[in-house]
Design a protein with these regions (language model features):
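Sec-dependent bacterial lipoprotein signal peptides
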Residues: 1-21
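Bacterial Sec signal peptide processing site at the extreme N-terminus
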Residues: 15-37
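Extracytoplasmic beta-rich repeat domains
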Residues: 28, 36-64, 92-114, 140-156, ...
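Structural signature of WD-repeat beta-propellers
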Residues: 74, 117, 124, 164-165, ...
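Loop/turn-rich, solvent-exposed surfaces of beta-rich toroidal or solenoidal domains
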Residues: 295-305, 312-346
């Protein structure tokens, strides 16, 4: 219990632990590490340390893959590029070093890295947005905004779009750094520590809101298209009134899927914003999808497969309760999640049964694994970047 409390003190509210602690500490029961018979063998292809990682902050530092490279950062300002195949370091820059904008202070990088248009983009809790050249890491431009940048930006239509911690969504010209538009949303008095990622579809940007809604705006000028309620406002105490949609929506076949905290998993028609179905699940981690199944990890560490056509539950795995799971990722024929002790767990996609397990880094993980070209890439809290494959 002491180890759990230490590791997740900053994230207690996000993981739903605070609600249990507020009334009865004994109600928090962390599942023991499952003892399994593995049928899938996972091997480490390469690993590298990227600075100091998140420095024990609740910062979802997540790598990005493009141009045959893996890009990763630490909270202090290190951004590095590695060869995707071999893991060899290609370049590294320090955005928080003496002589930079931040002098000797940490750059406070946060959220994920975005790539596109030969650029690498990363934001900071301080409100600084950095745009780098993907070839060598040189700074193309940087811009101060009036809010925290806590999630991965979107690069689309030659713009970089970010959701700020104060509820604003802001777009800049990717080449010049000039502001293109700004969209303002109301923010409740009490919200989770985080913001939704953004996705693009047919010239529009879609993102979750602290008010329990999904919003769509035109990328060209930021005009609102529609808002859809994932989780309606609720009464009760302050904790139950937190209804953020901090997960990044996903779109497939004209339907968007999103999940909220203290709320619902919803399927939404992209064209109109009409809610097609809702189911009662509480999550702040993003979803993943494969075939007809949606996969999600709930705030209390349960893993579910949901039929995306009907919203009906296909299977559930309760054996990782309160182990601080990341969002899921598809890895071969398995669903991969990582827990607070740094163990990667593989679940069969069709049944949810445990099929593999390996310890990656005992410092633990917050950001979701990244599955690309048959490999799984993970970045731990202490900055260890690991590439895995199935033997």
């Amino acid at each position: 219990m002491n180890k759990w409390t230490k590791i997740f003190a900053c994230a207690a509210l996000c993981s739903g632990i605070l609600a249990g602690c507020s009334s009865n500490d004994d109600a928090i029961k962390v599942a023991p590490l499952p003892l399994i018979t593995a049928s899938v063998e996972v091997v480490k292809d390469w690993e590298h340390s990227v600075g100091n990682g998140s420095d024990d902050f609740f910062t979802k530092l997540m790598p990005a893959i493009a141009y045959g490279k893996v890009f990763a950062s630490d909270r202090d300002g290190i951004v590095a590029a590695f060869d995707q195949e071999t893991g060899n370091k290609l370049w590294q820059v320090a955005l928080g070093e003496e002589g930079s904008f931040f002098s000797t202070q940490s750059a406070q990088l946060s959220g994920g890295i975005a790539t596109g248009y030969d650029k690498v983009v990363v934001g900071a809790e301080s409100g600084m947005l950095f745009v780098l050249n993907q070839a060598d890491g040189s700074v193309v431009w940087q811009k101060q905004v009036d809010g925290e940048l806590l999630s991965k930006p979107l690069l689309a239509m030659n713009k970089v779009v970010s959701v700020l911690g104060n509820g604003k969504v802001i777009a800049f010209d990717l080449e010049t750094g000039e502001q293109s538009w700004i969209y303002q949303q109301d923010v409740p008095a009490l919200t989770l520590r985080g913001t939704s990622g953004i996705i693009e579809n047919q010239g529009a940007a879609f993102f979750g809101m602290p008010s329990g809604k999904i919003a769509g705006v035109l990328l060209e000028d930021g005009r609102a298209i529609w808002e859809a309620i994932v989780t309606p406002a609720a009464g009760g105490n302050e904790l139950t009134s937190i209804i953020d949609v901090d997960s990044t929506p996903i779109i497939l076949g004209g339907t968007m899927y999103a999940v909220g905290y203290n709320g619902n998993l919803a399927a939404i028609e992209v064209r109109s914003g009409k809610v097609l179905w809702k189911r009662d699940y509480s999550a702040f981690q993003s979803l993943t999808i494969n075939g007809f199944n949606l996969y999600l990890t709930t705030a209390d560490g349960h893993v579910f497969a949901i039929d995306r056509r009907s919203g009906l539950e296909v299977w559930s795995q309760m054996g990782l309760e309160n182990r601080g799971l990341t969002a899921p990722a598809i890895f071969g024929d398995s669903v991969a999640v990582v827990d607070f002790e740094g163990y990667l767990h593989l679940l069969a996609q069709d049944t949810g049964e445990f099929v593999g397990q390996i310890e990656i880094d005992d410092d633990g993980h917050i950001a979701a694994p990244l599955s690309v070209d048959g490999r799984l890439y993970l970045q731990s809290k202490d900055g260890l970047l690991t590439a895995l494959s199935i033997k």
